[in-house]
């Protein structure tokens, strides 16, 4: 019976990719794919212009060919880690070349690393279809509203990072059996540290989060996938396992042998001892660098889970997790930031009048309701970083967009506004979004005025007040797989209506306004 339960977990370890990925590093079309992905990945994309060199983003293939040529010429460096201080494959001391080439290599390598993961999504003709136990953002909103109001405690978790670079390479080794590709990744990670003078006693992934976003996502997601894989396994086997048994999974080497040994240990020793650790009302939700672990159990039980997580990261990934990154809080008097909202469970007292024969009496009842508030100050801070307003919330023009056509400028501002309104549609109080909408509307007007070398007042008088109607009109009707949407954010509509729109496929960059620190 235990072997059947472990079969699903062994499938991940049994996956092996024998195809060689390393030759793809020298293919120009890989960098073209990475470049095209960058064009469509964000509405904040700004065309790259290479100042002083005469290149734009359409002719950057010349630089790609130069990069490939230099990597061919110094291919031996990948197998000789001792010489990368003296001989860099970039071949230039210019800071631009260093940053530009490092970004190209990281983006291209990220495309290559995605191949083994994408192949797992292609169904085989001989494979029996299986239902995947997956939960997307579509189900998180109803979960928060339906489940959290009935739970007692929450662990507010900042997933620990940075993680050592060598551990990341070992994690990817479970998925990629192409040794040259792993050597190249190790070489590039160390070389990137040298370019930026970022060598520290604890080399970490954090330095890649801003300058090499796509590679950072691949490395970070592989790390999170690894810890969640083992964590879910131990969670479902918690009826048999001790909380400290995660030390058996210190490395994925000889995973089959450890699993077979563990089955006998679980069956013979832990079947009746550890029943007190089983928590059937535990819920785990992760969103990027944060996670919540909610439970209906007692404070002692949730404290055990905190100790369990600290030991888990320490023994399984050789990572010392600071205990203060995991907070235990009761739902009754705690508000936590998650999924772009400030969430809390409100206790609403109410009195019910009852009549029994000729006697009347009042019964006081307490009801719990999950409430979400839009955090305006972090949103304004995000707009400030994106150069739409000052830190105090005063709208300013967007000079980089002043070269676009009027319709493109209005479309970009309108798209940001619609995405934010769409994402925060489930908030119980939407009045705060009017301020965000006002900032974007006036920033759009000032950008247009900057383009036409005029003032906002003269621009509106000349083009008409209906120029920016899009910011106050109803969102267009969109066919939804769940239900048909009505007015999303009308000017005079109800601001207390709570509707979770479940057709969100990608969260706008402005929804991620808190750093992972």
UniProtKB/Swiss-Prot annotation:
Example GO biological process: mRNA processing
GO molecular function terms noted in the UniProt entry: RNA binding
Compartment(s) where it occurs, according to its Swiss-Prot or TrEMBL record: Plastid, Chloroplast
GO cellular component: chloroplast
Main location as per UniProt: plastid
Domain of life: Eukaryota
Keywords: Chloroplast, mRNA processing, Plastid, RNA-binding, tRNA processing
A Pfam family reported for this protein in Swiss-Prot or TrEMBL: Intron_maturas2
Function: Usually encoded in the trnK tRNA gene intron. Probably assists in splicing its own and other chloroplast group II introns.
Homology family: Belongs to the intron maturase 2 family. MatK subfamily.
Protein name (record): Maturase K
Organism of origin: Paris tetraphylla
Gene that specifies this protein: matK
């Amino acid at each position: 019976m235990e072997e059947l339960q472990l079969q699903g977990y062994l499938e991940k370890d049994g996956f092996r990719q024998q195809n060689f990925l390393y030759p793809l590093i020298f293919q120009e079309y890989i960098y073209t794919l990475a470049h095209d992905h960058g064009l469509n990945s964000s509405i904040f994309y700004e065309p790259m212009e290479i100042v002083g060199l005469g290149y734009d983003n359409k002719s950057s293939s010349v630089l790609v060919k130069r990069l490939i040529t230099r990597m061919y010429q110094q291919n031996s460096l990948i197998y000789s880690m001792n010489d990368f201080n003296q001989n860099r494959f970039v071949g230039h001391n210019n800071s631009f070349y260093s940053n530009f080439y490092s970004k190209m290599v990281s983006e291209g390598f990220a495309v290559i690393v995605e191949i083994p993961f994408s192949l797992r999504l292609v169904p085989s003709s001989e494979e029996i279809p299986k239902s995947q136990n997956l939960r997307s953002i579509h189900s998180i909103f109803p979960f928060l509203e339906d489940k959290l109001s009935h739970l007692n405690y929450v662990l507010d978790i900042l997933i620990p990072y940075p993680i050592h670079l060598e551990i990341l390479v070992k994690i990817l080794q479970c998925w990629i059996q192409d040794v040259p590709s792993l050597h190249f990744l190790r070489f590039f990670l160390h070389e990137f540290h040298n370019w930026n003078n970022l060598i520290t006693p604890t080399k970490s992934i954090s330095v890649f989060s801003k300058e090499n976003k796509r590679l950072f996502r691949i490395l970070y997601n592989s790390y999170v996938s690894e810890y969640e894989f083992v964590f879910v396994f131990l969670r479902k086997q918690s009826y048999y396992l001790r909380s400290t048994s995660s030390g058996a999974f210190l490395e994925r080497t000889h995973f089959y042998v450890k699993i077979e040994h563990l089955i006998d240990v679980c069956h013979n020793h832990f079947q009746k001892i550890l029943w007190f650790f089983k928590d059937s009302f535990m819920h785990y939700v992760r969103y990027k660098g944060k996670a919540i672990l909610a439970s209906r159990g007692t404070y002692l039980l949730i404290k055990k889970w905190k100790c369990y997580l600290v030991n888990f990261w320490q023994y399984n990934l050789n990572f010392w997790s600071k205990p203060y990154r995991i907070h235990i809080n009761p739902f009754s008097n705690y508000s936590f930031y998650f999924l772009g909202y400030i969430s809390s469970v409100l206790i609403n007292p109410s009195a019910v009048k009852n009549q029994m024969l000729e006697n009347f009496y009042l019964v006081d009842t307490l009801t719990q309701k999950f409430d979400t508030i839009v955090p305006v100050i972090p949103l304004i801070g995000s707009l400030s970083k994106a150069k739409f307003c000052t830190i105090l919330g005063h709208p300013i023009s967007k000079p980089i967009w002043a070269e676009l056509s009027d319709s493109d400028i209005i479309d970009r501002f309108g798209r940001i506004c619609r995405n934010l309104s769409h994402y925060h549609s489930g908030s119980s109080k939407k009045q705060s979004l009017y301020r965000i909408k006002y900032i974007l509307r006036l920033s759009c007007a000032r950008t247009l005025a900057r383009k036409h070398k005029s003032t906002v007042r003269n621009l509106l008088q000349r083009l008409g007040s209906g120029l920016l109607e899009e910011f106050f009109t109803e969102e267009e009707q969109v066919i939804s797989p769940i239900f048909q949407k009505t007015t999303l954010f009308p000017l005079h509509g109800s601001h207390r209506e709570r509707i979770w729109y479940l057709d969100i496929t990608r969260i706008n960059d402005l929804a991620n306004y808190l750093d992972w620190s």
